[in-house]
């Protein structure tokens, strides 16, 4: 099973790429993390947020792996603890499908895309830069895996 992070945005600062890469390389081969960047839609005064999200939705859907479990990151999503994520990983592995975590653009995700998701997940109640969410998610996936393996990285 692969873990995909499909994120609107490109040209992230070097520290974002370094942070993401650090946690991605720690993952075992059977849970490899792959980042798929989606070009953000250009915003102008005449464009509505809905039209921007609709255009980004098409790009996101084109980047989603076929038959993947879609987990949309959304501020109104469910609050999960790291332990809940750690409990979900083995179940998802047994299911056999890849998991795609979707990070929207500045306006969020289109309602139709959120409806398609099997899970809406909130990463934080804080407002975070979208690039930082990539790093945070990669770290939490690594931490969740480390919990399932009794690895010393997680000492809770």
From Swiss-Prot:
Residues given in the record as S-adenosyl-L-methionine binding sites: 73, 104, 123-128
Alphabetical list of HAMAP family matching this protein: 23SrRNA_methyltr_H
Superkingdom in the source lineage: Bacteria
Main localization category: cytoplasm
Catalytic activity entry: pseudouridine(1915) in 23S rRNA + S-adenosyl-L-methionine = N(3)-methylpseudouridine(1915) in 23S rRNA + S-adenosyl-L-homocysteine + H(+)
InterPro entries found in the cross-reference section: Alpha/beta_knot_MTases (IPR029028), RlmH-like (IPR003742), tRNA_m1G_MTases_N (IPR029026)
Pfam family for this entry, one: SPOUT_MTase
Keyword Oxidoreductase in record: no
Organism field: Burkholderia mallei (strain ATCC 23344)
NCBIfam families for this protein: PRK00103.1-4 (NF000986), tRNA_RlmH_YbeA (TIGR00246)
Protein known as: Ribosomal RNA large subunit methyltransferase H
A GO term, aspect molecular function: rRNA (pseudouridine-N3-)-methyltransferase activity
Functional note: Specifically methylates the pseudouridine at position 1915 (m3Psi1915) in 23S rRNA.
Gene: rlmH
UniProt-listed Enzyme Commission number(s): 2.1.1.177
Keywords from the named record: Cytoplasm, Methyltransferase, rRNA processing, S-adenosyl-L-methionine, Transferase
Enzyme class: transferase
One GO cellular component term noted in the UniProt record for this chain: cytoplasm
Keyword S-adenosyl-L-methionine listed: yes
């Amino acid at each position: 099973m692969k873990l995909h992070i499909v994120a609107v945005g490109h040209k992230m600062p070097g520290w974002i790429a370094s942070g993401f890469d650090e946690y991605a390389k720690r993952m075992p081969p059977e849970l490899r993390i792959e980042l798929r960047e989606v070009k953000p839609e250009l915003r102008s005064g005449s464009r509505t947020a809905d039209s921007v999200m609709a255009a980004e939705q098409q790009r996101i859907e084109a980047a989603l792996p076929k038959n993947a479990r879609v987990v949309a990151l959304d501020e109104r999503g469910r609050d999960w603890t790291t332990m809940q994520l750690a409990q979900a990983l083995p179940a998802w592995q047994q299911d056999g499908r890849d998991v795609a975590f979707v990070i929207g653009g500045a306006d969020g995700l289109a309602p139709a895309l959120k409806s398609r998701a099997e899970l809406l997940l909130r990463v934080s109640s804080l407002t975070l830069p979208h690039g930082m969410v990539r790093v945070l998610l990669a770290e939490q996936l690594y931490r969740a895996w480390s919990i399932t393996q009794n690895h010393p990285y997680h000492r809770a």
